[in-house]
Amino acid sequence: MNHQQQQQQQKAGEQQLSEPEDMEMEAGDTDDPPRITQNPVINGNVALSDGHNTAEEDMEDDTSWRSEATFQFTVERFSRLSESVLSPPCFVRNLPWKIMVMPRFYPDRPHQKSVGFFLQCNAESDSTSWSCHAQAVLKIINYRDDEKSFSRRISHLFFHKENDWGFSNFMAWSEVTDPEKGFIDDDKVTFEVFVQADAPHGVAWDSKKHTGYVGLKNQGATCYMNSLLQTLFFTNQLRKAVYMMPTEGDDSSKSVPLALQRVFYELQHSDKPVGTKKLTKSFGWETLDSFMQHDVQELCRVLLDNVENKMKGTCVEGTIPKLFRGKMVSYIQCKEVDYRSDRREDYYDIQLSIKGKKNIFESFVDYVAVEQLDGDNKYDAGEHGLQEAEKGVKFLTLPPVLHLQLMRFMYDPQTDQNIKINDRFEFPEQLPLDEFLQKTDPKDPANYILHAVLVHSGDNHGGHYVVYLNPKGDGKWCKFDDDVVSRCTKEEAIEHNYGGHDDDLSVRHCTNAYMLVYIRESKLSEVLQAVTDHDIPQQLVERLQEEKRIEAQKRKERQEAHLYMQVQIVAEDQFCGHQGNDMYDEEKVKYTVFKVLKNSSLAEFVQSLSQTMGFPQDQIRLWPMQARSNGTKRPAMLDNEADGNKTMIELSDNENPWTIFLETVDPELAASGATLPKFDKDHDVMLFLKMYDPKTRSLNYCGHIYTPISCKIRDLLPVMCDRAGFIQDTSLILYEEVKPNLTERIQDYDVSLDKALDELMDGDIIVFQKDDPENDNSELPTAKEYFRDLYHRVDVIFCDKTIPNDPGFVVTLSNRMNYFQVAKTVAQRLNTDPMLLQFFKSQGYRDGPGNPLRHNYEGTLRDLLQFFKPRQPKKLYYQQLKMKITDFENRRSFKCIWLNSQFREEEITLYPDKHGCVRDLLEECKKAVELGEKASGKLRLLEIVSYKIIGVHQEDELLECLSPATSRTFRIEEIPLDQVDIDKENEMLVTVAHFHKEVFGTFGIPFLLRIHQGEHFREVMKRIQSLLDIQEKEFEKFKFAIVMMGRHQYINEDEYEVNLKDFEPQPGNMSHPRPWLGLDHFNKAPKRSRYTYLEKAIKIHN
């Protein structure tokens, strides 16, 4: 408790339990501090449950790992105490615990002194990640009579910010120092603490050492899965069967049996907590699935179903049913006639209601209790009609392993959400169930031993899951709290998880069991049979160990990654076929990648490269790809001799990965011992050549050349003709490819290279083409225009707006295209008319269609795509129309419901004139739907809110007045023949809607019904039954009411005659809706939540 909370502290003098509080240690001591007597731990050697011998012996040798202890702290010269004092540490769960005592004053009585008494944990630790939950009793010893000692309880999660907890005003100072009270003797006061701590988190807790078992890492909101997996793991017979499943040919990332084998194997052999990500990945879960908190019963059921199906046809087929399947019979027995219905069913778990039940026996009694079917709930006995009957279930067999689901999470209709029931519910360690079996076996009584208690702390919206397990069935319990496993007492495992309110603060109200696992006593040794390494197939062991070896290798590589760099080698054959700027496309090129030590020398790398590529060192030359200031990337000179001793990271200028163009001798000449020509870095230059063909609008790579810088352009023409396969002396046009969107023509062929090319450097590119007049007829007659077109070229994904998650198709377009050019290109791909397409921008903030484009849009494609990031896929949406876009743009989209002649609703979208009226909308609807054969052919538009018709719109009403809203729906229907002409004096169309008990809970399809003044209501009922096509037996359950202003009055069906005034608004209240006829009956249609994604059933996909 902080200092503000201390202001609300209760009077210690009244000895009421004040709120526990935390307090920071107050620094400093008095000049003459009170002397402290260190008392030994009273019960340091507390009894601890057994486990594996090694763990037990270790714990006996070192009591610091114990779970509880009582220790005392005596303060001498107590009356002179002026500062806080600390006791020596007592180690529990290997954490230091100290008693802290100090003088305090009551906040509301500043002149009245009190004793502050706190328990401190691990205060001197520098770590900020540790935590430990503990319960403690703080006591001041009465030396005359221990029964009069004053004590208070605390329960707290200790962590670095709240490392002490207790009471600022534990007792009044005057009471402690009053010799008559018995708390002080010779100016000495003894303080005592009994602390009981859970295993800590965030510290070096060795679960394997202390218990013999390891935990599971918490993967997020699937933490309940850890409890289930531990429960299944300790069902040893199941574990054995899982090991025996053949998985040799299974995909390691998709096989559920293999993933389960892996988890079980690691739980059995690992010394550290085991991960479950590979298991959930094998389920085929998406991110949302993995973090949705499902019922543990649901996960248990689908997981065991999946494993059971994979076991079919193997040596362990039938293991799941053998362990978990029981049989029951559901029966219905008629009372008055000789009719009985029996249905035998298999079950794999039992769901027990706990609301209002004291213990598990009462829940079983309730489960098999006989239900009376009478009154409105009579049983339909076929030819015998509706009959009074008794309904119930009886257990035929109970399985060896009994899973009991305690229904702590239930739906609350008042709040329309699930709630958690934290009521106390008791369950025994031994559970006799013979009395619930239809037939018992004296040789094999249905006596069960508690094996697992799955516990939830928190409310319906979240919390924490743990499981208490009795691994060997011998009453020695362990607590599995995700990655931490610790010994615990039988009381902690059982009684502390009953739930309900308790004065004992060690039991938290919201912590209780939600699932129990019992094992039949006669099957205990079989179900919990020892699982040894001999039970695990050798091939499985080898596969899992190989996985571990590979993971360790990858982990080592990650740890050493900072020592290495990647060198990407690109060969000259990757330049061939490239149709863009520079020498290759970085996203398409295939590199040969080398992992190189950053501190290795260039000479060492060249030697390794030579051996790997199969070329002697004099047949290769390295040209690092260097980024130029103009945005291009070209090869640059690397001097092997001068730079041979330099390190790779130094030469790469910390570039990682480092890309190098590897020049080699022609493979055909390499065998003859040919070497690369000499290259004088001071006087020579390396140039790349490309040939452009206007007829095919393509580039052809023509290799590279070494030439002196003083060489004239004209001297290169013969080489170009030769490389391109042209006749010598063919007239050529030359360009320098400077950068994207800048290609300059070389005009003067009689000047040297350094004057002809802009800033001559190694890696410059010359593009040449034939000087042919016929090229003028080409779409892109020159290389300059080709590169300009290339610069504006863009790949656009077009997705159909009407198809959810449509992957679409890619079209290569020019940024300079206008709307019609784009539409024409896309229409050719879709084999349709450009005028029958409508396009939509992509929303910038999320992936989806935005506003539609008008057909007279004046911008270019570049304008449409300007908000996309450079490397982001460019996307536009389209929809195909049934009318030309010029006509379509003058219409509006109108979503509504169509009620067909079979009284079924379907959603349709109509496109009436945006300035039209309801009549135009109805005419459009006639074109889109199929009308009934024996109907009027006339349509009407209804407005529906909350499943009630609130109005019929007139045909001359403008559509502009009908604005859509989420709370209302428009419905179009054909007017029945009997409703075309209404005698307004004696007839009326009344709204009919469905509800169940509460008139605000309407549902189903409302409709209009014609009623006549004075007609008997039975006639109205006949028309309703005919319209809804309901069987007589079902229709008998309907009640009818007139609903006005939210209140309903039930109709006496035998006496009531229709009075039209009952369905007219009250005088003076014309603004209120008309009364309507309500049909009160049960809603058999499933209610759908607005949050349907949260109700998605859990599913294992593989």
UniProtKB/Swiss-Prot annotation:
Its EC number is 3.4.19.12. Residues 19-31 have a biased composition (Acidic residues). Residues 214-521 form the USP domain. It is linked to Hao-Fountain syndrome: An autosomal dominant neurodevelopmental disorder characterized by global developmental delay, varying degrees of intellectual disability, autism spectrum disorder, poor or absent speech, and mild facial dysmorphism. Most patients develop seizures. Additional variable features include hypotonia, hypogonadism in males, and ocular anomalies. There is a cross-link at residue 869 (Glycyl lysine isopeptide (Lys-Gly) (interchain with G-Cter in ubiquitin)). Residues 1-10 have a biased composition (Low complexity). The modification Phosphoserine is found at residues 18, 49, 963. Changing residue 165 to A: Loss of binding to p53/TP53 and MDM2. It holds the Pfam family USP7_C2. Residues 70-205 are annotated as: Necessary for nuclear localization. Monomer. Homodimer. Part of a complex with DAXX, MDM2, RASSF1 and USP7. Part of a complex with DAXX, MDM2 and USP7. Interacts with MDM2; the interaction is independent of p53/TP53. Interacts with DAXX; the interaction is direct and independent of MDM2 and p53/TP53. Component of a complex composed of KMT2E/MLL5 (isoform 3), OGT (isoform 1) and USP7; the complex stabilizes KMT2E/MLL5, preventing KMT2E/MLL5 ubiquitination and proteasomal-mediated degradation. Interacts (via MATH domain) with KMT2E/MLL5 isoform 3. Interacts with OGT isoform 1. The keyword Protease applies. Expressed in neural progenitor cells (at protein level). Widely expressed. Overexpressed in prostate cancer. There is a cross-link at residues 869, 882 (Glycyl lysine isopeptide (Lys-Gly) (interchain with G-Cter in SUMO2)). The modification N6-acetyllysine is found at residues 869, 1084, 1096. The gene is USP7. It comes from Homo sapiens. Induction: Up-regulated in regulatory T-cells (Treg). Down-regulated during neural progenitor cell differentiation. This is Ubiquitin carboxyl-terminal hydrolase 7.
